[in-house]
Amino acid sequence: MRWREFGALAALLALAATAATSADLVGAAEAGDSAAVRAQIDSGANVNAADSGGTTALHWAAHLGDVSMAEALVTAGADVNARNAYGVRPISLACSSGSGKLVKLLLEAGAEAEASRSGGETALMTAARTGNLEAVEALLAHGADPNASERNAQTALMWASAEGHEPVVKALIAAGADLRATLDSGFNPLFFAVREGRADVARTLLAAGYDVNEALQRRTRPQYQHADSGMSPLILAIENGHYELAVALLEAGADPNDERTGYTPLHTITWVRKPKNSDYGSDPAPEGSGNLSSLQFVQTLVAMGADVNRRLANGHSIAPKINVQGATPFLFAADKADVPLMKTLLDLGADPLLPNVEGTTPLMAAAGLGTTAPLEEAGTEQEAYQATKLLLSLGADIHAVDSNGETVMHGAAYGSFPTVIQLLAESGADPELWKQPNKHGWTPLFIAEGYRPGNFKPAPLVIATLEQLMVAEGISTEGPRPRHIGTYEKARLARQQVRIDPRTR
C-alpha cells in the first residue's frame, strides 16, 4: 500500500515539475532568453504549453523575431499553427516583427500561409504593412491570396500603398493584386498612397495603369472626416500638404484646373494654408511632406497651367455668408486674410477686384464678411487689418454694395474688428454706409449689437467704435431694431409651426 502511495506521489511530483518547467519555458521565451529556452527544452518541458492567454513560447519567439529560438522550438515539435486566446498564430506575429527568415521558417514547418487574425487581417496584410519583402514573397510563394480582404474590405495592396512600401507594392501587383479594389469610402490603393504622401508608390501605381485624373466616388455616407466625391489624386495631395507629390501628379498629367469637387487646386490651397475654424481659432495646416512650401507650390501650379483668375461655376458653401459661385482663388485668400498668399497670387497675375456672382468683393471678404464665428475662424483682426489695407492700396472700391445689401463695413462688423472699422473710416468710407441696412434689415451697428445669425452677445468695443464714428458724422445711433430670433428660438418656433418673418433669419 505504501509503495502505491509513494508511486502516486512520485507521479504527482513529476507532473508538477513538468508543469513548472513548461511555465518556465514560456516565461523564458517572453524574456527573450534563448539559452534558458534551450535548457527548458532539454529538460523535457512541454514546448506547446501556453500561459493563461493561450500564448506559447513560439508565439513569443515570433513576436520577438528571434529566429534561433523559434528554430529550436520548431525542431522540438512546437505547433506552428497554435492560436492564442485572440486567435493569433505565430506566423502573424512573425510578420508583425518584420522577420522574413522567421516567416520562411514557419511556412516550411507547416504554418498556414492564409492564417488570419480576428477581423480578417491575414498574415500577408500584416507583412505588407510592415514592409518586409522577403516575408511577402514567401507568403505568396506558399499560396497566400493577394486579394484577401479584412472586415473593412481593405487589402494587402492598400496597406502596402498607405505605408509607402514600394517593393512590396510591386510584388503584390506582380502576384495579381487587384488594382481596382475600392472601399465604400471611394479609396483605392492610389488614393491611400496619395493621402499619406507616398510619391514613389503613387508613381508605381500610375505606371501600373491608374488614371492620374480619376475621381474618387463614395458609395456610402462617411462617419468621419472624409474626402469629397469627385476628388482627384491632385486635390487629395494638396489637402494633405504633399506639395512635391502634387507636382509629380501634375507632371504625370493631372488637370491643374480640376473643379469636380466644386473647387480648383488653387482654391483648395487657401483653406489648406489656413484651415477652417475650430473651438480654439484656426487649426494648424497639415504637416505634409517634402521641402516645397505652399507658396512655392502655388507658383509651380500656375506655371503648369492653373488659371489664377478661375471663377467657380458652383460649389458648396465654405462660409454661409459668401456665395462661392464666381469666386476666385484671390477672393478665397482674402476671406482667410492670408496676405502672403494674396501677394503671391497678385505677383502671378490675380485680379484683386473680381467679385463673386453676388458682387461680394475681396475687400468685403478681407474685412470680415462671411464670418460666422468671430475669434474661431482663420484670420485674426491684425491679419484682417493688413489684408484690408492691402486691398485699399490696390484701389478696391470701399463703397461697393453687393446684391445682399452688404458693404465692407458690414464685413468688419461681422468679424468684430474695431481696428478695421477705424481703418475704413480713415480711408474715406461713406458715412451713409454706416447706417446702410442689408437685406435682413441689419446695419453694421445692429450686427455689432447681436442682430445676426445664431445667438450672439453684443460686441461692446465694436459698438463703441461705430457709435463714436457715427456721432462724429452726425448720424443717429438710435432707431428701431429688427426683431431678432436666435437659433434655439427659431427651432422652437419651427416645432410649433410658427411662420418666421424672413427678415429675422
Predicted features and spans:
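Ankyrin repeat boundary/linker residues
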Residues: D51, N84, R117, E150, ...
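Ankyrin-repeat-protein effector appendages
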Residues: A19-G27, H142, A208, Q225, ...
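Ankyrin repeat domain, specifically the short helix-to-loop turn at the C-terminus of the second helix
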Residues: I41-A45, E71-D79, K104-E112, E137-D145, ...
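N-terminal segments that cap or nucleate solenoid repeat domains
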Residues: A20-W60
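Conserved ankyrin/ankyrin-like repeat signature
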Residues: A36, S68-M69, K101-L102, E134-A135, ...
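Ankyrin repeat A-helix N-terminal signature
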Residues: G27-A31, W60-D66, L93-S99, T126-N132, ...
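Start-of-repeat signature of ankyrin repeats
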Residues: G54, G87, G120, A153, ...
